[in-house]
Amino acid sequence: FLLRVRKKLTGEESNSAKEADASTGENDMEVEKSASAVEKPSGEGGKGPEYEERLAKLKDILSGKTPTDLYLHFLYIHSKTDLLILKSIKDKLKPRNTVTHIATIMSHAIMNSGTTIDTFLRDNLQWLAKATNWSKFTATASIGVIHRGHYKESLKLLQPYLPSGNSNSNSPYQEGGALYALGLIHACDGGEQASFLQESIKSKNEIIQHGASLGLGLTAMATGDTAIFEELYEIIVSDNAVSGEAASIAAGLVMLGTGYEEGIENLIGYAHDTKHEKIIRGIAMAVGLIEYGREEA
C-alpha cells in the first residue's frame, strides 16, 4: 500500500503497478484519493518551497528511509556489544574448525545487526580470511547484516568485494556474498539497487547468480514487479541447483503476499519437471511467500 502511495506521489507508475491497479479496484481508489489529497493541498496552489519540502519528507517517510535512518542512529549510539567476548571466543577456537569459525562471524553479525559497527571484522582481517568457499560467502554477507539500512554508503562499503571487470577479481564466493550483503542492506527499500543486481544475475557463475538473486529478491521485496519475477524465473528453468534455489526464493520475495497466480502455476509446473531437490525446496518456499497473509483469500 505504501509503495503504491509513494509511486503516486513521485508520478512514477510502472507496468507492474498498472497491472496490480487493474486487479485491485477499491483499494486503488482509496490510494488515488489519498495521493490526490496530498498532491492538491488547500491554499495558494501548494507548489511553494515549503510544500516541496514537506512532500520530500513525506516521500522519505513512506519509502521507509526516515524510519530506517532513525533506527540506524538509535542502534549505533545504544550498542552494548562486548568485543572482549568475541575476542575470547576467537582466541579459543581451533585454527582449522570451519564450523565454529563461521559461527563466530555470524554471532558477531547478529550482535551488531543494524549498528554499522564492524570494528571486530576490521581488526581481524587475517583471521577472517581463513573462511573458504561457502563460509567465505556467509562471512561477506554478514557485512550486510551489520550495515542493514546504511543506504548511502552501501556500494562504498562493499566495493572491494563486489564483482568487477578485472580478470584478477575476488573469489566468486566473496563476490556472491557481497551481492547478497547489498540486498540485506537495501532490503524492502522498493528496489533501489535492483538495476545493479539485475545486471549481476546475468553472470555465468552459479555462485554469483545465487548471491545476486537473493539480493535482488530482498531489495525488490513485495514490489510485485513482474519483469524481475520473469528474469528470476529464467534462472530457475536453467535447471542449475545452486542458482535455481536462490532464484526461486527471490521470486517469492518479489511477489510477497501478492497471490500472483500465473507465477505460482509456472513455479509448481516446473517443480514437477525438475529433479533438483534444492529447486523444489526453493519453489515450495516461493509459493508460501507469494501467498503470505492470504489465508482468507
How should each PLM-predicted stretch be described?
Residues 3-13, 17-19, 23-297:
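Alpha-solenoid helical-repeat scaffolds
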